[in-house]
């Protein structure tokens, strides 16, 4: 019989940098999960990802205090800022542009995030990511 899921914990942890300090420790500790076991497993699975990239993770905690976790792709905002070479988005995106991304960069981001996007085809996914870029104050070039 399958184990019963007691809790779902959603966190955003930097790749290769999980440690027992907040936010990881308190979130897992209140559910009785072995924090160091999670940190070691997470850091091992994120070795192939650029160190320090934020990785959303969903942790399923079971009744016997065991756990499994699913990693998502880094947020579109992080990938867009990295592609544009800027530190943060604009405080006033409609009037103040902070950087530029090309269509080729958008397509590269779409390929990275393909598993997490709900768009039916490549063009729709590119439009979705382009909308995120514009909302952050990045201009989009064709």
Curated annotation (Swiss-Prot):
What GO annotations for molecular function exist for this entry? large ribosomal subunit rRNA binding; structural constituent of ribosome
Question: Which NCBIfam families does the UniProt entry name for this protein?
Answer: L11_bact
Q: Name one GO cellular component term.
A: cytosolic large ribosomal subunit
**Family of this protein:** Belongs to the universal ribosomal protein uL11 family.
Organism (species)? Pseudoalteromonas translucida (strain TAC 125)
Gene name linked to the record: rplK
Q: What does this protein do?
A: Forms part of the ribosomal stalk which helps the ribosome interact with GTP-bound translation factors.
| Post-translational modification remark | One or more lysine residues are methylated.
Q: Tell whether Ribosomal protein is among the UniProt keywords.
A: yes
- Biological process (GO), any one: translation
What keywords does the record list, in alphabetical order?
Methylation, Ribonucleoprotein, Ribosomal protein, RNA-binding, rRNA-binding
Q: Which Pfam families match?
A: Ribosomal_L11, Ribosomal_L11_N
Query: Known SUPFAM superfamilies for this protein?
Result: Ribosomal L11/L12e N-terminal domain (SSF54747), Ribosomal protein L11, C-terminal domain (SSF46906)
Q: Mind telling me what this protein is named?
A: Large ribosomal subunit protein uL11
Q: Which InterPro entries match?
A: Ribosomal_uL11, Ribosomal_uL11_bac-typ, Ribosomal_uL11_C, Ribosomal_uL11_C_sf, Ribosomal_uL11_N, Ribosomal_uL11_N_sf
What interactions and quaternary structure are annotated?
A: Part of the ribosomal stalk of the 50S ribosomal subunit. Interacts with L10 and the large rRNA to form the base of the stalk. L10 forms an elongated spine to which L12 dimers bind in a sequential fashion forming a multimeric L10(L12)X complex.
Where does this protein have coiled-coil stretches? none
